């Protein structure tokens, strides 16, 4: 081998080693963020399901936390073979199950975020109509319908693109993934439109302090999705529709997806925290949800208790 060719081979080997090291760093960060996200979403799920007063928007966040929890669990398990550099490999049906379950939870979380954005926008634009005419069980029905529709799409994709229910159909599989791509685009546009209208309504509202709680939470969650959650959806659709994407986008989208799911509980607790005061997590989450009436009742009860003790 000539010296020039030897140098080229050595340079290629060094570049490959650097790529492997970089990918390992990204995957390790993804695992760490996923673990933090599991703890954060687990805390949100526990607080919303047991201790915190359930306003309509709390039910949305309860379902979002559940979807994120399942997504992160599958996400962390799915990247273990890449992290261990081929020393461990899952059977094909396990890899397929993890992949389809991740996309299912991703679409559920996005659909719920769209639903809560639209409902918060309606509450800001038409407060009188919303408070008087809103169906009592609207949130529960929307959440149940979202899970059911996403499950139907999940089963159709599994039946057409995998061997779970028989021989896969390439034509039907590609058609369903195109439907999923259109669905993702429609959901993103609807969410952005509702969030923009909500932002304009908050800015143009009467002369009063802007709401620190739930509207701000929704706007931050939407921004978080656009910058961190959307790359995973783009990667997943491109992969299944056989569109060309850069190789580095694979690990990048996995990292940003972990950031997206792990950062949402941080946003909840940061928005609900009181500057200069340490509050229980239950009250912090209530403040983020805008349960001012419930918080007032809690404070009044606390004051009465102190008075009774003093007496």
UniProtKB/Swiss-Prot annotation:
Query: Which domain of life does this protein belong to?
Result: Eukaryota
Primary location class: membrane
GO molecular function terms noted in the UniProt entry: G protein-coupled receptor activity
User: Membrane side Cytoplasmic: which residues?
Assistant: 47-63, 117-136, 199-216, 273-311
What intrachain disulfides are recorded? none
One GO term describing the cellular component: plasma membrane
| Membrane topology designation | Multi-pass membrane protein
Stretches assigned to the Extracellular side: 1-25, 85-95, 158-177, 238-251
User: Keywords for this entry?
Assistant: Cell membrane, G-protein coupled receptor, Membrane, Receptor, Transducer, Transmembrane, Transmembrane helix
The record ties this protein, via InterPro entries, to: GPCR_Rhodpsn, GPCR_Rhodpsn_7TM, MRGPCRE, MRGPCRFAMILY
UniProt cross-references to PROSITE patterns, sorted A to Z? G_PROTEIN_RECEP_F1_2 (PS50262)
* Transmembrane domains' residue ranges: 26-46, 64-84, 96-116, 137-157, 178-198, 217-237, 252-272
Where does the record place it? Cell membrane
What is this protein's function? Answer: Orphan receptor. May regulate nociceptor function and/or development, including the sensation or modulation of pain.
PANTHER family per UniProt: MAS-RELATED G-PROTEIN COUPLED RECEPTOR, MAS-RELATED G-PROTEIN COUPLED RECEPTOR MEMBER E
* Family to which the UniProt record says this protein belongs: Belongs to the G-protein coupled receptor 1 family. Mas subfamily.
Q: What is this protein called?
A: Mas-related G-protein coupled receptor member E
The source organism is Macaca fascicularis
User: What gene does this protein come from?
Assistant: MRGPRE
